[in-house]
Amino acid sequence: MKIVTGSTAANLPACVATIGCFDGVHRGHQYLIEQVHNIAKAGGLASCLITFTSHPRQVLDTDYRPRLLTCLSQKIECFEHSPIEYCVLLPFTKELSLLSAREFMRILHEMYNVQTLFVGYDHHFGHNQGEGFEEYCQYGKELGMRMMQSRALVEDGTSISSTLIRSCLLAGDIKKANAYLGYSYYLSGRVVDGKKVGRTLGFPTANIQPLCAEKLLPATGVYAV
């Protein structure tokens, strides 16, 4: 997978792309990514994933403190295990947030060579996110860009989402969170001194201070690793 930034966008081949925050890169995201890969392969196009270098809400609300399932480096690591060929890292700015959906689509088409844009079932973009898939399809016809939409990945009657996984982690249900993620939730950090609880449990424990301050911590407890 090749990482693409603003300076290298001009070198992108014609592609099928999807766009989003992809927090957690969970099974719902993996399902979407697999479809992008298959559509691109069938059409003889490259496959591309476009994501943001920071959470959009952080830019629009400076007081907002996200609780992320994956920081940017972890997301990229997950993407590298997918069949996607290109990953565009797009800085989210206030100027970008003011673009209409049509103008944003024009930029994707002209700057990033997006020929087909494949979006999630609940994905919205453009200023105030006031438009939906029908409007995107109309703009796509005007711009010469095909629009496609994925269905939700449903398990036990529930759509797999980042919000659902956060709820599981905050409730301490790591098993269910991992099932929705498709891999084991993990933290990267350094070991710090704690309350020496391990001495009373009969087995060693370690207190981890996450390297990513925005990383979501599961419910308080002692977890096996």
Annotated model-derived regions:
Residues R102-A224:
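Active-site cores that bind ATP or allylic diphosphates and position pyrophosphate for catalysis
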Residues A9-C71:
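N-terminal catalytic cores of NTP/NDP-binding nucleotidyl/phosphoryl-transfer enzymes
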Residues C71-V88:
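A glycine-rich helix N-cap at a beta->alpha junction
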Residues K2-T8:
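Short acidic-hydrophobic, aromatic-tinged amphipathic segments that line or gate anion-handling sites
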Residues P66-K75, S97-M105:
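Glycine-rich, highly charged phosphate/nucleotide-binding loops
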